[in-house]
Swiss-Prot record:
Spore wall component. Glycans are attached at N290. The keyword RNA-binding does not apply. The lineage of its organism: Eukaryota, Fungi, Fungi incertae sedis, Microsporidia, Unikaryonidae. Component of a complex composed of at least SWP1 and SWP2. This is Spore wall protein 1. SWP1 is a major antigen recognized during host infection. One of its GO terms (biological process) is sporulation resulting in formation of a cellular spore. Its main location: other.
Length: 388
């Protein structure tokens, strides 16, 4: 009976341990009282129970302290065999902690895509900038030449200030006196004043008309891009618009000459009494001659201005054509050098392929094969890693 009771007690003790093992860390060192009070084992097993519970408490305490220094995933892997736990946990912890590698003050390394930009993207961008600067410089020169031409035309127009010399009125007055006409003493001065006034008015009219046309053209060209300016020059529109400055000048000169004649005739009409027909003929012939001289004078002056402007326009077009031709030649050489530099950088074998013969081709094939093998190995590694 004693043996049977002992076996039953041992079986009960084993069952209790099986049910309570997950919560063994809660057992105090004096847990043997629980078994003693329930008369499960007897006093001779108290020391063994105390030893088991104390060891379990130490193990669980050690497990909790170690889990606080690693990730939760690492603590779950702790029940694996030692080597498997060490390999998987260390790699997992490395992957977990790698996300925090940029939190320190040290700068993170650039991504691979950015580091590889220096091979292709950066050289192309720099080449594009150099080409842009080359062509932009040409466009600026072209535009500045046209603007300078128009500015010089404005300067010539502003300097257009011819002074009509006027007629010889003293001779006319002497002739009238011989015909018995009493002429006021200030008649010659009054006629000369009319000449000066009409001359000045005509000069201002010519200047105002020309300045308006050229100033408007200068304002429009200043706001244009190169292609529009080039089209304006090559189509002949620039030349026609500049020439339009002089299209309406001749009618203005003619009208002003007629006004001059009418105003000077009015001076003699103020003379009291009836003038003899010979005096009227002398006055008419003298004033008509003065009008003709006035029109001829200003026609010549404006023609000289027009010729000067036309010569400047011809010089401008010639210089622009020369600039375009020279720049095109220089740009072709410049662009070829830039492209050659890029080709030798990206395709270094192509520069030596003519001299290398078949060896160059085989070398390229070998490199490609190696690259292909590397890519396949990389794929296998990723597949294995994913399976694991």
């Amino acid at each position: 009976m004693i043996k049977l009771s002992l076996l039953l007690s041992l079986a009960s003790f084993t069952a209790v341990l099986a049910n309570q093992r997950p919560r063994c860390q809660r057992c105090p060192v004096s847990s043997s009282k629980y078994f003693q009070q329930n008369n499960l084992l007897g006093s001779r097993f108290q020391n063994e129970v105390q030893r088991l519970c104390a060891r379990r408490v130490r193990e669980e305490s050690s497990s909790e302290s170690s889990s606080s220094s690693s990730s939760e995933d690492c603590s779950r892997r702790r029940r694996r065999p030692h080597r498997e736990w060490e390999d998987s946990c260390s790699s997992s912890y490395s992957s977990c902690s790698s996300t925090d590698s940029c939190s320190s003050s040290a700068p993170c390394p650039p991504p691979v895509a950015q580091r590889c930009d220096i091979e292709l993207k950066t050289p192309i961008i720099l080449m594009g900038e150099r080409i842009y600067e080359f062509l932009k410089n040409y466009e600026d020169q072209y535009k500045k030449a046209v603007l300078l031409f128009l500015t010089n035309i404005l300067s010539q127009i502003s300097g257009f200030n011819p002074v009509f010399p006027g007629g010889d009125y003293d001779a006319l007055i002497e002739q009238l006196k011989t015909l018995g006409v009493t002429v006021p003493a200030n008649t010659a001065a009054e006629l000369a004043a009319i000449d000066a006034a009409e001359s000045s008015a005509l000069t201002r009219a010519i200047q105002a008309n020309a300045q308006k046309v050229i100033s408007d053209l200068l304002t429009r060209v200043s706001a244009m891009c190169y292609l529009d300016i080039m089209s304006l020059v090559n189509s002949g529109l620039l030349a026609s618009q500049v020439s339009s400055v002089f299209n309406n000048i001749q009618p203005i000169i003619t009208i002003t000459g007629n006004d001059l004649f009418a105003k000077q005739m009015a001076v003699f009409q103020k003379i009291p009494g009836t003038l003899p027909s010979a005096a009227i003929t002398a006055i008419t012939n003298a004033l008509q001659g003065n009008r003709t001289n006035f029109v001829t004078f200003f026609t010549t002056q404006t023609s000289n201005l027009q010729t000067s402007v036309q010569n400047s326009l011809t010089t401008l077009i010639s210089e622009l054509e020369k600039l375009a031709t020279d720049t095109e030649t220089a740009f072709t050489a410049f662009a070829n050098a830039e492209i050659s530099a890029l080709i030798s950088r990206i395709f270094p074998t192509s520069t030596t392929s003519s001299g290398s013969g078949d060896s160059t081709g085989s070398g390229s094939t070998g490199d490609a094969g190696d690259a292909g093998d590397t890519g396949e190995d990389g794929g296998d590694d990723e597949g294995t890693e994913g399976t694991g």
